[in-house]
From Swiss-Prot:
It is found in: Nucleus, Nucleolus. The keyword Nucleus applies. Keywords: Nucleus, Repeat, RNA-binding, Translation regulation. Gene3D superfamilies: Leucine-rich Repeat Variant. GO terms for molecular function: RNA binding. Residues 1-84, 677-753 are annotated as: Disordered. Sequence-specific RNA-binding protein that regulates translation and mRNA stability by binding the 3'-UTR of target mRNAs. Residues 322-675 form the PUM-HD domain. This is Pumilio homolog 23. Residues 23-38, 47-57, 73-84, 677-688, 699-712, 719-728 have a biased composition (Basic and acidic residues). It comes from Arabidopsis thaliana (Mouse-ear cress).
Length: 753
């Protein structure tokens, strides 16, 4: 048996001689195991069956017809920095296998583990590329990097800096590179470690900026590069939004469904990061020719790198005014002419490339972060008079949605209205309902063309000689209706899934004043009781009913809908989405209907208590109190509502944005309308995508109770701010992307020209 421990696993650096040079046949390894540990296996990337790094270079962009899949320039630099792997000798393989077995046994003490990690990392000196890219040993190396001390980690990074891009572009090596960056991020809480970490990062960035195109266009390398950008910024390395994923918050903002705007566009930065290093790295990534940038725009992986870089520079307008012109391949701000300008020929190129999948994603992000002057220039020079043409394109329609959502003023809203509103029917028929939803949302946000938008949507769904009573069912089943050949014979589709975007459009519609949406209100309240019940059971349709109950529609109209749900509240409460509708109905109805709801929930109390949402709903509606003492329960309900009505009267309900209702008792049903109680679950109720689950547990706690980790986050933030609160040296202002780094001061953003 082999004895394994810190003493039996010393560093074997004395055995490393000239064989450490990077020579030998690429791809060979002595670790030809017949069977590999399933727990150590990594998933293949889609479309990538082998281990060859070159296979990851393939451009998988959607591709505009005028864009070449790869430029001649790229084919030249694509193979400039190829490394060949040397075989791993059996003794080295055995050494790391013993370490893996030792760590798996969980018999190593913390101090001994640190010594083993240090010795093993020292063993990789001069052979970092071979060991990091070995499919088996790379797993062990990841464990070592995650468990070593900071000085050992930084030493490994500095030693491997010259081959770091090659490691990052390898299928196995990319995981090692990411582990190294993640491990560095864990030490950022220690202010004393910043200088050491910055030195290690500088050694990596210096090599990357010498030839960034290879790494940007590689499927593995681009992912590592995005993590490196996040680390330099000081943000979480695992934020999905920074890796191209569209979050529910982004969709909520786009469709104007978000209640609070306080946290819009706020990027959580737990650490101060390395602003000088970020500037240096971005300068190197963007210092390429116009021809190279044309390729980077449409390459799947480099586009993601550019998107991450733009999101990290959010609200830094001065820097964005330098970065975005470089990405769009137009000249930076002309000093002789005030403001930012896009030439006509460049605007045409941007417009033609917009139909490319990767470039369309990139332009979406540009529109999200663009300063007002740049947005206005793009709107007038690129998009104006081409909105409908782009709206019906498979990729460009998402760009138009982003453009509409970030409209600055009513004048722009008017231009978009003139080009798109007359074509609402065409957009819906071609499945581009997202463009319609975005225009309706921005109309409500800018308070412009509200009535016209509502009327245009009615005209798109119902012909002139048709009754408007069918507007709601057709929007609920938008795809079924427009997919029907003979629309005059279309009927309600029982049991079918309701259209998510159609329901989102209706949620936006019910945010308008009731004066603009009477056809929609009439259509909803005129639906058959079984249709109303089916809508409430659907996860998307339930949100439409909730939006209607939260609107400023008349009290009698809301009551008419709630009455049609009578007899089904118990059944609805057993559904996760339906339980929210039950709660909304309870808040919006009179005492008689509240009793009916409580009675129905009491009948299903046993089954309801077993569901995820049941305990909260039973407690919120006080079903136990109703069961034991119904008279006292009724008195409490009246007292609660009366107290709230007095509060609204005293503090000016006319200025409130909340909807009104007067369902206190039977005697007060026809009185003046009052404001609906603000729902403590507003974030859940206004969740933008109906396919997502809504959870009650986190809302059942006291509102004043801080979220887990909130106190700790604030303490860390204060500590960091105190550590970085130093007087800034006065000096001349330099361009953001102006060249090379000057020194290693992390507080400096200046670069040599």
């Amino acid at each position: 048996m082999v004895s394994v421990g810190s003493k039996s696993l010393p560093s074997r650096r004395h055995r490393t001689i000239e064989e450490d040079s990077l020579m030998g046949e690429r791809g060979k390894s002595s670790n030809n195991h017949s069977e590999r540990n399933k727990g150590m296996r990594r998933k293949d990337h889609k479309g990538n069956r082998g281990f060859d790094v070159d296979s990851s270079k393939k451009n998988q962009s959607g591709g505009a017809p005028n864009v070449k899949p790869a430029s001649k320039k790229h084919s030249e630099f694509e193979h400039q920095n190829q490394f060949v792997r040397k075989e791993i000798d059996p003794e080295t393989s055995k050494y790391f296998s013993e370490i893996a077995n030792l760590f798996d046994s969980n018999e190593v003490e913390l101090e001994e583990r640190s010594v083993i990690c240090g010795n093993a990392l020292e063993e990789t000196r001069g052979r970092e590329y071979e060991i990091a890219t070995d499919y088996i040993i790379s797993h062990v190396l990841q464990t070592l990097l995650e468990g070593c001390e900071l000085d050992q980690l930084c030493s490994f990074i500095r030693n491997s800096a010259s081959v770091f891009p090659a490691i990052a572009m390898d299928r196995s090596g990319s995981h090692v590179a990411e582990s190294a960056l993640k491990s560095l991020a864990t030490h950022l809480e220690n202010p004393d470690a910043y200088s050491v970490i910055e030195e290690a990062l500088h050694s990596i960035c210096k090599v990357i900026v010498d030839n960034p195109l290879d790494m940007m266009c590689n499927c593995y390398g681009s992912h590592v590069l995005r993590r490196l950008l996040c680390l330099c910024k000081g943000v979480s390395l695992d934020s999905p939004e920074l890796y191209g994923a569209k979050s529910s918050k982004a969709l909520a903002k786009r469709l104007n469904l978000k209640m609070s705007q306080l946290d819009d566009n706020n990027l959580e930065i737990p650490h101060q990061g390395f602003p000088g290093m970020l500037t240096y790295l971005l300068s190197g990534l963007l210092s390429c020719s116009r021809e190279d940038m044309k390729y980077l725009q449409v390459d799947q992986y480099s586009s993601l790198v550019l998107q991450t870089a733009l999101r990290l520079m959010l609200k830094q307008d001065e820097q964005l005014l330098e970065i975005i012109p470089l990405i769009l391949r137009c000249n930076s701000t002309n000093k002789k002419v005030e403001g930012f300008h896009i030439e006509t020929n460049v605007a045409k190129e941007i417009l033609e490339s917009m139909k490319d999948n990767s470039f369309s994603h990139l332009v979406e992000v540009i529109l999200e972060v663009a300063p007002e002057s740049l947005y206005n220039e793009m709107f007038n020079k690129v998009f104006k008079n081409s909105l409908f043409e782009l709206s019906v394109d498979r990729c460009a329609n998402f760009v138009i949605q982003a453009l509409i959502s970030h409209a600055r003023d009513q004048e722009q809203m008017g231009i978009m209205w003139e080009e798109l509103a007359p074509r609402f029917k065409d957009l819906l028929e071609q499945g581009k309902s997202g463009v319609v939803a975005s225009l309706i949302a921005v109309s409500q946000r800018l308070q412009s063309h509200e009535n016209k938008c509502c009327e245009a949507l009615v005209g798109a769904v119902c012909s002139t000689n048709e009754s408007r009573i069918s507007i709601l069912p057709r929007l609920l089943f938008l795809d079924y209706y427009f997919g029907c050949r003979d629309k005059s014979t279309w009927e309600w589709a029982p049991g079918a899934k309701m259209h998510v975007m159609g329901c989102l459009i209706l949620q936006g519609i019910f945010k308008f004043s009731s004066d603009h949406i009477q056809p929609y209100i009439t259509s909803l309240t005129s639906m058959k009781a079984e249709y109303i019940t089916e809508t409430a059971k659907d996860s998307s349709g339930a949100r439409v009913i909730e939006a209607f109950l939260a609107s400023d529609a008349a009290t009698k109209q809301k009551r008419r809908l709630i009455i049609k749900l009578r007899g089904h509240f118990g059944e609805l409460s057993l559904h996760t989405s339906g339980s929210f509708t039950v709660e909304k109905c309870f808040d919006a109805c009179n005492l008689t209907l509240r009793e009916a709801i409580a009675s129905e929930l009491l009948d299903v109390k046993v089954d309801l208590s077993k569901t995820k949402q049941g305990p909260y709903l039973l407690r919120k509606l006080d079903i136990d109190g109703y069961a034991s003492r119904p008279d006292q329960w009724k008195s409490r309900q009246e007292a609660k509502q009366s107290t709230y009505n007095e509060f609204c009267s005293a503090f000016g309900s006319n200025k409130s944005n909340f909807p009104k209702n007067t369902f206190v008792s039977d005697a007060s049903e026809d009185a003046a309308q009052e404001i609906e109680v603000k729902n403590t679950r507003k974030e859940i109720d206004h969740h933008p995508t109906s396919g997502f689950k809504r959870h009650r547990e986190k809302h059942a706690k006291d509102k004043d109770e801080p979220f887990a980790g909130e106190k700790r986050s604030k303490q860390k933030k204060n500590k960091t701010s105190e550590a970085t609160d130093k007087p800034k040296l006065a000096g001349s202002k330099r361009p953001f992307l102006s060249g090379e780094m000057t020194g290693k001061n992390r507080h400096s953003n200046k670069m040599r020209i």
